[in-house]
Amino acid sequence: MRGGVAPERALPIAAEETRDPGALEVAARVAAGAPIAEAIAAQGKPEWRVLAAAWGLAERSGAPLAQALAGIAAALRELTRLRQQRTVLLSGPRATVRMVATLPPLALVLGGLLGFDPLPVLLSSVGAALLCAGAVLLGAGVGWARSLARSVESDDRIAGLEFELAWIALRGGAAPAEALVRVADCVDEFGAEWVGFDCFRAGAPLRTALATALRVGVPVGPLLLEEAEAVRARARAELESEAERLGVRVLVPLGVCVLPSFIALGVLPVLLSMLGGL
């Protein structure tokens, strides 16, 4: 589009180049006559709806579409970086859970190798009770630990998008108050849930940044982009802190459930086998 290609033509070209299934579906809808922003929003995923809101906002406000999409694309790439960073940060707690979960069966194997066969004990009524209790505790502990990890994974969003969208509206020549209205309308129309409506209330960071720029007399656009990057930097720092806290919290299910399971499945059967052989 920066080279002068019309959006209706640029979209299928980009879809063919990338061979992305989502982009191909959007191009097919546009070819069937759907408006581009609506075709993008029909993909249903949050990142597509954000892109649809940015596209529709640029079209309606008269902002340069190529620049608007470049800014949103840079913001959306942050999602990939966050997912990669989160995978790395959570690898430690996940490895801890997997390692500790293997201890009970390993203890049984080790006891057998040492000559204390725990199988007769496990086949007795006492052993059956130990097996049931240990299995329940082990399953509960692993499930609990995994749920803690999923709670960190569930916050899958990009922060600061309201600043990017407001910048697009302002690039179209709208006054700050009108720009906020246009952004809110597009967010509502295309269902961009990563941009909450509380972002537009009085005292919110977006309104504070606009008021500061107008009061001091600095250019609004660069200030909004700087604020967007600052918000995303804080989100990255929060992700790191949350992953560090997870490394501590995951010790609770390991201590409350997995350790007793290790005793029930790995220690007591071997100990009873030893005592029975005396």
Predicted regions and their residues:
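Bilayer-spanning, highly hydrophobic alpha-helical transmembrane segments
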Residues: 85-142, 240-278
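Residue-level signature of catalytic and energy-coupling elements of molecular machines
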Residues: 148
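Catalytic metal-binding core of the metallo-beta-lactamase
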Residues: 1-93, 152, 157-252
